[in-house]
Amino acid sequence: MNLHLIWATLIGAVLGSLADWLFAGVLFHGRYQVHPEVWREGAGGQRHRIILAQALALVTAGAFVLLAWKLHQTDYKGALKLAAMIWLIGPLPVLLANALFIKIDHLVTASHAAGWLVKLLLIAAATAWMLG
């Protein structure tokens, strides 16, 4: 297996995790309590949930890297376009549909949507850097 695929995945996962931290953890942090009944109570299981979320970031990065490699979209232009298309197909519609039916502050939804776009673009940049 090409070692560059692994490096692209690891770098993409780290960058994606930083995007998650900023857009889902820092921006509009106080707005999460506009509808506190939506969120799980207590901080007891947060560490476990954070570890699982980081594992998902690794899966996201790995899947993106492999898809870009398989589709021969490993240059910057191709990888960034692929990231934007994935965002339009997956995270954006899901987040907007959730906002229609779940009481989530609109700024939180916007932050999560922007975070997903940035995460995918960063993974794309890591992919192009390592494989392009």
Give the predicted meaning of each segment.
Residues 1-132:
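Juxtamembrane/disordered regions of integral membrane proteins
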